[in-house]
Amino acid sequence: MNQANACWGVYREQAHSPNRVDDDAAIMMRVGEAMAERGFSVNLVTSDAVLGAACVNVFAMCERGPILDCLGTMEKAGAVVVNASAAIRNTYRHRMTELFAQHHVSAPVSHIVATDANKPRLADRLWVKRYDFHATQSDDVIYAASESGWRDALRRFAARGIPFVVAQEHVEGDLVKFYGVRGAAAADDAKWFEWFYHRDKGMLGHRFDVARLRQAALAAAAALGLEIFGGDAVIQANGEAAVIDLNAWPSYALYRDRAAQTIADHLTERFERRSRLAPSTRS
């Protein structure tokens, strides 16, 4: 096995995988197996192993800021990291909110609000979410359908030392989940896309064009710079999809084997292209 093809896969931190630790680990292991089948020497590690590590190509599920800083240093030294450290950081909710607005992504109206602000409710129904990470516990997302509910949500976040929230206006419709893999260059370069209805939610049965959902999801991923992504969208009565959440590297639980092969093909292309472009180290 060619050690020049060495790469690391970095697991997501368990605190960032509520009720998904096994599923998140499973997709990483399956991608690692698929990369080994393609001739790579793969080392699957926890995020703490990245601290102070040498420069190596990486596929990463991790989310903590200090780990992303280390991955960013590797990138500056010439390593390929997928998803890029900046793209992973862009999934922090306050960044996502700003980037979705800048790139006109089809998404609910969202507001960044200080938890100590004496601010009246911004809409009749709101999803109040911590401003940085995706949910690590049930209280990281609170539904507020009244003024008292809104103020209680702010108090609860403030009591936990969380200084800001994203208040996302509720959108009525059918909840769907989607998974994708896209190229790093063009916004619409979809290598694979799949969707399904959320099994735990009631259905209104709104008709829609899957191509429009795909377009909205890819635009959202491109806005954040994600290549490997998944998320949630609401299909509205007019058939339009509103992206309500986007994650870097989901568990792909229903499509793990297919996703792993597509991801491995994508990683192989990314890692080998960088190897071809890198300047020779021979004297």
Predicted regions and their residues:
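C-terminal active-site "lid" helix and adjoining low-complexity regulatory extension at the edge
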Residues: 31-33, 208, 222, 226, ...
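A short glycine-rich, hydrophobically flanked beta-strand micro-motif that places a catalytic Asp/Glu
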Residues: 44-47, 165-168, 176, 226-238
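A short beta-strand motif that forms the metal-chelation/ATP-contact edge
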Residues: 55-60, 126-129, 178-180, 239-254
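Phosphate-binding site of ATP-dependent enzymes
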Residues: 142-224
